[in-house]
């Protein structure tokens, strides 16, 4: 509940009350990182928050905003053929831009993010992170604005995520998810 409330404050309120916050030049954060041990509900929390935000956006009487949920599992992006993983990253962000052009707010949720956005290595070779991480960064910061597009990453191992991904201005809201208690 604590994580949900924190994300709701940062994400839901700015989207639902844009007219007020636009006067203050507040921008919706670009990204969130949910991390914690396996089985603590990172994916479930992310889906629940985004589903709730999308529902509230569509119910808002004065708002014509709609949200679109793009769910991706990190390992599904991996491909042994040169350039295919990068192409899949481009397709995900193109889909988000297409939704944005239609007046919808896209939410990209990447589960098991450490599998594709791991720390780059200094040595040359077939390390997929050496090409996927720069592509991901280029898509997030590129010429075509991702304004009001929210990216959520979920991982068991935040220490494996490349520092370029989790720096301020990209994925800068980090939330630790703890295992559920008997309560």
Locate each region found by the language model:
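Walker A/P-loop NTP-binding motif of AAA+ ATPase domains
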Residues: 1-183
């Amino acid at each position: 509940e604590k994580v949900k409330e924190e994300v709701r404050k940062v994400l839901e309120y700015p989207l639902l009350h844009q007219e007020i916050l636009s006067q203050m030049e507040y921008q919706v954060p670009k990204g969130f990182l949910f991390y914690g041990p396996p089985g603590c509900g990172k994916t479930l929390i992310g889906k629940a928050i985004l589903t709730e935000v999308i529902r509230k956006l569509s119910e808002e009487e004065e708002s014509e905003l709609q949200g679109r949920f793009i769910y991706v599992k990190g390992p599904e992006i991996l491909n042994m053929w040169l350039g295919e993983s990068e192409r899949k990253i481009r397709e995900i962000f193109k889909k988000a831009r297409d939704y944005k052009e239609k007046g919808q707010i896209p939410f990209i949720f990447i589960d098991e993010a450490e599998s594709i956005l791991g720390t780059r290595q200094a040595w040359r070779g077939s390390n997929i992170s050496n090409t996927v991480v720069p592509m991901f960064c280029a898509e997030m910061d590129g010429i075509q604005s991702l304004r009001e597009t929210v990216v959520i990453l979920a991982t068991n191992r935040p220490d494996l995520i490349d520092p370029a991904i989790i720096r301020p201005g990209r994925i800068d809201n980090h939330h630790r998810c703890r295992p559920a208690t008997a309560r």
